Amino acid sequence: MTGTTENDNTGEDEKPKDEECAAIEHKDKFNPTAYLNSFYKTASEDTAMQIVLFFLPGILYRLPQKVRSVLDLGAGPTVYLPISLRDRAENIYTSDYAPANRDTLINWIEDKSDFDWDNVCSWIANIEASMETGKQMQNKTRKLMRAVLDVNVHESPVVQSIVWKENEQVQVPDKFQVVSTVFCLEYSCETLEAYFRAVRSACSLIDEGGILIQGGVLDATTYNFGGKTFRCHRLKQAHIIESLKANGMATTAEQGYKFITHDDIFLLVSKKL
């Protein structure tokens, strides 16, 4: 699952109170259409999205020029990470815990999406100084999509099943050269123990010498959209460092670690040692 924080400061007493949901309820209560319209209709509508898209090229610059395999772990209904990786990745796999999100991803891959990603593509292209149109960027990315996976970072195996494949010849690897997971791990749970489990699951999918790209929000306890408030783990930077160390991941620049943060939104890249 992915998510950012949406605040409402109207103070109107008559406004209906959001339904409060546990993190585990993402599976059945997450509305991909409401989520995309709240946070991704235009990249400029959400500060967290602006920050992620602005800093993402600097993170991706640290990847090899060509990446054999990428897994977008807990993508929700979003495709901005595959689009951003379209010139480096050779094979992209995407995934989520919620069936509705997986259906949304499949619809986008098959060019049947109801959501218009052109505004986000324009934002990415401006940062990249690319002359490609949104349609060109998306079509190039679609050709790289190999499978959509059902995943659960709190169970073993993490990859529960393959729900869509480009063709019958596609073999989903056990591990990937790059695993990206943005607005996912801390939103998948509500306790520190569960967060550590989620990080362990993510790192277990990375090849030796491979790379983790992680992004999220520090110090958030909930996020809300579409009349629902989802609880999440209140993440601290110390939790990030401790969990990476525990799973054999780089935590210093010399090892292959970079951490960028602005307004409690963070992105990091960490090499598997």
Curated annotation (Swiss-Prot):
UniProt keyword Repeat, yes or no: no
SUPFAM superfamilies in alphabetical order: S-adenosyl-L-methionine-dependent methyltransferases
Catalyzed reaction equations: nicotinamide + S-adenosyl-L-methionine = 1-methylnicotinamide + S-adenosyl-L-homocysteine
EC number: 2.1.1.1
Pfam family, one: NNMT_PNMT_TEMT
GO CC field: cytosol; striated muscle dense body; striated muscle myosin thick filament
Keywords, sorted A to Z: Methyltransferase, S-adenosyl-L-methionine, Transferase
Residues engaged in binding S-adenosyl-L-methionine: Y35, Y40, G74, A75, Y80, D96, N101, N152, V153
The organism's place on the tree of life at top rank: Eukaryota
GO biological process per UniProt: methylation
GO MF entries: N-methyltransferase activity; nicotinamide N-methyltransferase activity
Disrupted-gene phenotype: Suppressed lifespan extension when exposed to nicotinic acid and nicotinamide. Reduced reactive oxygen species levels when exposed to nicotinic acid.
Matching PANTHER family: NICOTINAMIDE N-METHYLTRANSFERASE, NNMT/PNMT/TEMT FAMILY MEMBER
UniProt similarity note: Belongs to the class I-like SAM-binding methyltransferase superfamily. NNMT/PNMT/TEMT family.
Function field: Catalyzes the N-methylation of nicotinamide and other pyridines to form pyridinium ions. Involved in regulation of lifespan extension downstream of the sirtuin sir-2.1, probably through its role in nicotinic acid metabolism.
Protein name in the entry: Nicotinamide N-methyltransferase
